[in-house]
Amino acid sequence: MREKLLGWATDALVKLDDEAPGILARVLTAAPSRRQAIFAALAAREEKVGVFDVGDGPFPVSFAEIIRHGRANDILRRAFGAVPDGLSGLLAQIGERPLPRPKDYIVLHDLLVDDDVRGADALRGSGRITCRKLEVLHTLDPRWRHANALERLDTGAEAMTFNKAVAFVQSVNTKASDEAVAGAIALMRPTSSLPRLLDRLLRRADRLPPHPVQQGDSEFRPLASMRDLMEAGRRYRNCLVHRMADVAAGKMAVAEYRAECLVEFRPLTRGAGWLLRDVHIERNRPVPLALIAEVEAKCDQMGVPRIDDSGDGGWKSYRRFTGELEWG
């Protein structure tokens, strides 16, 4: 039972209890701030920092007495020397049990020593401090360190993915400055999420890749802005609004043909141009073959390649005669 409550600190506390009987009982009944100060002091010895940076020698003479009778700040000063402002308060947010690894206490101490105001404020505002939160905070770009982000990211890997996602949004939205993104994170409501925040910023993208269809074509209208894409998605009642990231990244492009259908293009490798990929009508219903043929003829005229269906041995004639429809 004692090992479960005291974790890795158990052996050190048993030794200290031999020097100053009553330490174990004192730790087990101490308030969270004082108990965590003791764990932080023991972590400093475990990690050889602070006054313990000389090695694994015996505890200093007065250390056991400080642990037994001292206040939280007295214990921290005895272990680290100078105590950065706010350390005792952050330690109290850990709760009753020690963090799983001694080095996590050193990370917390160094955060304040390095004057990481954003990181410290993020921890103060995000409730109980865990090793997971420290991992997320360490991985999260310093610009996005806020309690609202810290509470919504579960792992360091997820924080890394978020960093890259923000970088992508900033690359296509000139208004998504560091200040704008940080401000949006700070203003998040309790029911909001980071994916929704990024989606809102993406919908304002204004730096899209060049479109394969030029403006001014009499039959093709390039959907070259996010507003065009969202408006077309509403009219055609399909999933186009969920493909806007693909458009912004240059992984696909969409144009409207004679206000009858949406034409999907995909990029060829090595920047060799674009390929006609598909044709869609309202609600992704089956597309009439005659309409597909018109789109293909237009793309042939523009020099846009497509999948070659020639040499079919009467297959197209059969489909045309029987009225079979192409499914989008």
Predicted regions and their residues:
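Sequence-structural signature of the catalytic-core scaffold of metal-dependent phosphohydrolases
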Residues: M1-A205
